[in-house]
């Protein structure tokens, strides 16, 4: 009996049961993993929170029409120039094939949606870029739609609010795309000279020719938290200046800290912030001047 204490225990035997190859019937898209904190949450809960992570506050990218639906009063949006589409002025190989793929992927005809709307009853002309379409690069149609939207705001005496998200100028349109930087900037200047109010909201990412032109020309320049905002890439700058850049370089928080933004606003607070600004700048029908915000 005592000898049993010193004998080696017998190894347990395990049987492997083959899988039948079936998977649990979980609907695709029911869960979303945050790329920032790696937490997994129900997609519906994330959508209820305006696609802002419930755990870390990361702002997930959203499409133009989703953003408009989140922001403006229900039923108030009237789209402008919806059928304006891109040509291929330089005959760039496969360009139109890529445009067609992006149309199918995004449901849009171009990388920006513009139109009339109201926010908490305050009228405005709004433009929202969509990075699913050619990374919202600015070509001739994007520039033209911004120009027309600004002119519409000028004509109707409404503020202009633009949400930017872009990889910069569209290389497939060459010099024509670069011309849009001057074209949009000049439109902003004319509108400003006429007393128009411009609000820009930079979202992730706002880079290249868009950041270097109209995106930075608002009377109010805002950004969503964590947005990448800059002209050239980080590595290019470091190689040029031969210095190591700060960890938070080219983020919305870095720009705010250095006086290049008026505020960094969570998507959850943006509607209230915009409605307040639109209200205090509202022009009274009697005088055409700004109201006292009462």
From Swiss-Prot:
Location (main, coarse): cytoplasm
Cofactor binding comment, as recorded: Binds 1 zinc ion per subunit.
EC number: 2.1.3.15
Keyword Lyase among record annotations: no
One cellular component (GO) term of this entry: acetyl-CoA carboxylase complex
One Gene Ontology molecular-function label: zinc ion binding
Any single biological process term in GO: fatty acid biosynthetic process
Keyword match Chloroplast: no
Catalytic activity annotation: N(6)-carboxybiotinyl-L-lysyl-[protein] + acetyl-CoA = N(6)-biotinyl-L-lysyl-[protein] + malonyl-CoA
InterPro entries in the cross-refs: AcCoA_carboxyl_beta, Acetyl_CoA_COase_Trfase_b_su, ClpP/crotonase-like_dom_sf, COA_CT_N, Znf-ACC
Localization in the cell: Cytoplasm
Zinc finger (C4-type): 34-56
Domain of life: Bacteria
Residue stretches making up the CoA carboxyltransferase N-terminal domain: 30-294
PANTHER family recorded: ACETYL-COENZYME A CARBOXYLASE CARBOXYL TRANSFERASE SUBUNIT BETA, CHLOROPLASTIC
Oligomer status and interactors: Acetyl-CoA carboxylase is a heterohexamer composed of biotin carboxyl carrier protein (AccB), biotin carboxylase (AccC) and two subunits each of ACCase subunit alpha (AccA) and ACCase subunit beta (AccD).
Family assignment from sequence similarity: Belongs to the AccD/PCCB family.
Protein's UniProt name: Acetyl-coenzyme A carboxylase carboxyl transferase subunit beta
Species assigned in the record: Listeria welshimeri serovar 6b (strain ATCC 35897 / DSM 20650 / CCUG 15529 / CIP 8149 / NCTC 11857 / SLCC 5334 / V8)
Gene name linked to the record: accD
């Amino acid at each position: 009996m005592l000898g049993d204490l010193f004998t080696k225990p017998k190894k347990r035997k395990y049987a492997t049961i083959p899988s039948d190859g079936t998977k649990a019937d979980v609907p695709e898209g029911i869960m979303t993993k945050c790329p920032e904190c790696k937490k997994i949450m129900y997609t519906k809960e994330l959508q209820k929170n305006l696609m802002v992570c419930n755990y870390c506050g990361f702002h997930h990218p959203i499409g133009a029409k989703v953003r408009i639906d989140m922001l403006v009063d229900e039923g108030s949006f009237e789209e402008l120039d919806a059928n304006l589409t891109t040509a291929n002025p330089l005959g760039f190989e496969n360009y139109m094939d890529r445009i067609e793929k992006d149309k199918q992927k995004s449901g849009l005809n171009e990388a920006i949606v513009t139109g009339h709307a109201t926010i908490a009853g305050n009228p405005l002309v709004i433009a929202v870029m969509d990075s699913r379409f050619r990374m919202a690069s600015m070509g001739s149609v994007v520039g033209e739609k911004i120009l027309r939207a600004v002119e519409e705001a000028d004509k109707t005496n409404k503020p202009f609010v633009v949400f930017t998200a872009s990889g910069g100028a569209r290389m497939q349109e060459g010099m024509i795309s670069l011309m849009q930087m001057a074209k949009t900037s000049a439109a902003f200047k004319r509108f400003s000279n006429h007393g128009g109010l411009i609000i820009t909201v930079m979202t992730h990412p706002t880079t290249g020719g868009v950041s270097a032109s109209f995106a930075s020309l608002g009377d109010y320049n805002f950004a969503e938290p964590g947005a990448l905002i800059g002209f050239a890439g980080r590595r290019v700058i470091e190689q040029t200046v031969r210095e190591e850049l700060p960890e938070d370089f080219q983020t919305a928080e870095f720009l705010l800290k250095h006086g290049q933004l008026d505020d960094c606003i969570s998507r959850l607070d943006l509607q209230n912030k915009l409605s307040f600004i639109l209200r205090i700048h509202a022009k009274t029908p009697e005088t055409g001047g700004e109201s006292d915000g009462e």
